[in-house]
C-alpha cells in the first residue's frame, strides 16, 4: 500500500492509500475454502438487539449463483447492490479492496477528484478567518470544494442491499477508502473485515462549529441509516495509514479528514455489534445524530458486546433516544485526545454492565461517562484497571461522573431491562478480550 500524503505543503496532488488491483472476474465463492463455513452463519437467537424482530440472517438463504467472491472495487459495488433487489446474496471479499481505484484498476488521488479549479491552497487563502472573518464560506471556491467532494462521494460511497451477508476470507480481507452505507434496508451481516480510512479529500471549514471553528468531513467507515436488523461482527475499524494524530492543523484546528467509524442514525434499529476492534479514532460512534430528530424515539435499539474500544477519543458510543446495551466490552482509555467513552445524550437509555476500563495516561474514572443532556444511566458490574496491569477494582460509573461533574449529574433510574442477552460474562473474563476481537480471526 501507498501512504496518502497529507496536504502539509498545501497541495492536492496526493495519492490515497492504494493497493494493487487484480483483474479476476467475480465468481461463485468456494464455500469449502475455509474449514468452517462462516458465509451462511446467522446471528443466534438472543444475541443482542439484532436478534429481535425477524432476526438477522443476512444472505444465508442465497442460491449458489448469488454467492460471489470479489477482489476489486467494481466487483464489490456490483455485488452488494442494488438496494431494490431483495434476493439473498453472499459477498465474499478476498483481500483488501481500495475504494479509490478506477474501473481499470488505476489508483485515484485527491487531485483526480478536484473539479472546477479547486485547490486547498486557494481555499485556505480565501477563507482564513483573518481575511474572510467568521461567516460561513461561500462563493466559487466553496462551490468547487462541494463539487469536488461530490465527485469523490460518487466513487467511494457504496450502498448495501437487504438480505445481504458481506464476509471477508482470510486474515487481510477488507475495505480501505470506502464509505459503506447501509441505508433503509434490512437484514444485513458484515463480518471478518477491516474497514479502514474512509478519507475525505475535501473537508469543509465551519467557523461556527465550537468556539474557534472546525473542519468537518463527510464519510463514516460504515453508516447505518434507517436500517433494521444488522449484525457487525469480528471486524476492525481504523484510520489505516492516515491516523488522526498525524493530521495537520489549519486555522488553529485539526484538518479532520474522517468522520465516524460506525455511526447508527435516522431510525436505524435492532443492531448487534460484537467482537470488533475499534482503533484510535477521535469521534468513534454515535447512536442518534440529532437532538431534534424525535422520530428516533422507539428506534435506535443497539447492543455492543465483546468489543475492544482502543484509544478512542470520544463516542464509544454517544447515544440519543435509543435503548443501548453495552456489556462485556474492553476499553483502553489513552492519549491526549481522550474526552470520554460513554455519552448520555437526549432521552438516552444506556445500560452498561460488566465492562473493563483500562485507564492510562492519567485518565480518571470520572471521565469515562459524560452527560450530553441525558437523565439517567444504568451501570453495574463494571471495573477499572490502570496502565494495562494490576488488579481490577469495581467502579460506579455514575457516581464517579457526578463527583467530577456535579452540575451535570446523572440519575440511575432503570427504565428498561435488556432481554436479548445470551450470557453476561463476569468482568474478570473480559480482561483478556482484546486478543479475541477484530478481523482475520474467523
Predicted features, each with a name:
Residues 74, 96-99, 171-172, 362:
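Acidic glycine-/aspartate-rich tracts in secreted/extracellular proteins
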Residues 78-86, 101-165, 173-191, 197-206, ...:
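Extracellular beta-strand-rich solenoid/capping regions of secreted or surface-exposed proteins
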Residues 1-27:
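Secretory targeting and sorting signals
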Residues 34-59, 109, 114-119:
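Long, low-complexity, mixed-charge
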Residues 318-442:
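Extracellular beta-rich repeat passengers
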Residues 26-36:
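Low-complexity, acidic Ser/Thr/Pro-rich repeat tracts that form intrinsically disordered stalk/linker regions
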Residues 45-92:
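Acidic Gly/Asp/Thr-rich repetitive segments characteristic of extracellular carbohydrate-active
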Residues 162-172, 186-199, 220, 226-243, ...:
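Right-handed parallel beta-helix
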